[in-house]
């Protein structure tokens, strides 16, 4: 047990990343963890796990990031990972209309397992490909409002809004009520630092 476990336990929160194949789930995690992007696409096999410490104003939390495979053959594994998650990050590709439509199914899956006791963030990724955009920002905002979930657009490749995504999620975590209701533009005041001891599950899938 580390010294940080005495008196002031490090609160851990599980974030599960969901969405169709190749929408950029792994790339968002890689950008957040290592501030890097791999142009070579490799599908995640099964489930991958990483964790990162975030320093949020007067408290520290440990985010456990679960990266799920988008392929149909791994779908049966996913409900068990949703079941005890605090946050579900549902990702679609703004250049792929089908991936956007499928987010309704993913969100339904989350609510089937977790009811309303979960934070859901809808993420439109790949804004760097705006010339190929098939899903407008307004469509994403409208769906998020209809389904009562949070919304943000990102580019894992360019790094656009990736830290902001995690800041907003962290500010909405249980016990963060003092920041949960702040306007989104104020979320930038949440301090994000890299942990000196980031960990990766040695049995995880690919990290690209």
UniProtKB/Swiss-Prot annotation:
Its main location: Golgi. It comes from the Eukaryota. Residues 179-208 have a biased composition (Basic and acidic residues). GTP binds at residues 19-27, 67-71, 125-128, 155-157. It is found in: Golgi apparatus membrane; Synapse; Perikaryon. InterPro entries: P-loop_NTPase (IPR027417), Rab (IPR050227), Small_GTP-bd (IPR005225), Small_GTPase (IPR001806). GO terms for cellular component: autophagosome; cytoplasmic vesicle; cytosol; endomembrane system; Golgi apparatus; Golgi membrane; lysosome; neuronal cell body. Keywords: Actin-binding, ER-Golgi transport, Golgi apparatus, GTP-binding, Membrane, Nucleotide-binding, Synapse, Transport. One of its GO terms (molecular function) is actin binding. Disruption phenotype: Larval lethal. GO terms for biological process: axon guidance; compound eye morphogenesis; exocytosis; germarium-derived egg chamber formation; intra-Golgi vesicle-mediated transport; intracellular protein transport; oocyte microtubule cytoskeleton polarization; phototransduction. SMART domains: RAB, RAN, RAS, RHO. SUPFAM superfamilies: P-loop containing nucleoside triphosphate hydrolases (SSF52540). Gene3D superfamilies: P-loop containing nucleotide triphosphate hydrolases. Protein transport. Regulator of membrane traffic from the Golgi apparatus towards the endoplasmic reticulum (ER). Mediates membrane trafficking during egg chamber growth and organization, possibly upstream of exocyst component Sec5. Also during oogenesis, plays a role, together with BicD but independently of Sec5, in the polarization of the oocyte microtubule cytoskeleton, in the localization of oskar mRNA and in the anterodorsal secretion of grk. Required for anterograde opsin transport through the ER-Golgi complex. Belongs to the small GTPase superfamily. Rab family. PANTHER family: RAS-RELATED PROTEIN RAB (PTHR47977). Interacts with Rich and Act5C. Interacts with BicD (via C-terminal domain). Interacts (in GTP-bound) with GCC1/CG10703 and cbs. Interacts with Gorab (via C-terminus); binds to a Gorab homodimer, this interaction seems to be required for trans-Golgi localization of Gorab. This is Ras-related protein Rab6. The gene is Rab6.
